Amino acid sequence: MKALLKKTPAPGAAFETTDDLRIKPDEVLIKVHRASICGSDLPIYGWNSWAPERFKTPSTFGHEFCGTISEVGASARDFKIGDFVSVESHIFCGLCYQCQNGQRHVCREMKIIGVDGPGGFGEYAAVPA
């Protein structure tokens, strides 16, 4: 597949062909139709002082995207091939004090698709169902 790949810990990115994604049983594979550039993508592209703390190269970035489901993992529920989806890229733990008190947006264990793992600046993206 083609993807915008951050190959090295330096400014810039490259549009390249990468290996096809394989999903885990609890994930869905999304054929990305649209992705947007967010302010948090800029530090990754420019490789400022924040980027090395969170983003590991090589990887695809981008956390705001939508598309259609092209594959459903064996244990994923409530999704089917062809569903149009918009991705909630912030994955919270559900267990910490903040999550237990309705403040998931400040979860201490928050992981972000496209920051802490591969994202949506490619033809396909694998995301938790």
Feature map (PLM): residue ranges:
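NAD(P)H dinucleotide-binding glycine-rich loop of Rossmann-like/cofactor-binding domains
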Residues: 93-129
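Cytochrome P450 core scaffold surrounding the K-helix E-X-X-R motif
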Residues: 40-46
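Glycine-rich beta-strand-centered segment in the early N-terminal region that forms part
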Residues: 21-35, 49-97
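Glycine-rich phosphate/pyrophosphate-binding beta-alpha loops
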Residues: 40, 86-90, 115
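Short N-terminal binding/cap micro-motifs at the start of the first secondary-structure element
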Residues: 10-15, 39-40
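Short loop segments at secondary-structure junctions
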Residues: 8-10, 70-75, 129
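Short structural boundary motif marking the start of a folded domain
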Residues: 1-4
